[in-house]
């Protein structure tokens, strides 16, 4: 895999949506960089090695996989200047205070971007989101009704 893709998939410098969508069940670890000169013919970029390991303890139950991935997708593609605004659009107005409270408990800045969250933070936000009684996704807005 290309070095930069490997780094992003392993969450170095910020996670991709795909990484965040798999994190509750799989850990990604960067192993090493492989110089382009190690290949024949040599590509124009370095390669990278990484490992994927199934977590011994899931961060989110497998039965919630689809809902969790939809939640992460909505957060990564949602509008807003930070995670507080983005998640605030996913819940009914009366639940927005819960978003800010949960972010505070997690030590996540309101202005943080989705790529800056850890696997554990994503999992705990999802659990909290489920408890807020979000309802079903609204088309176009990425928001949920309550």
Residue spans for each PLM region:
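Class I S-adenosyl-L-methionine
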Residues: 1-116, 121-146
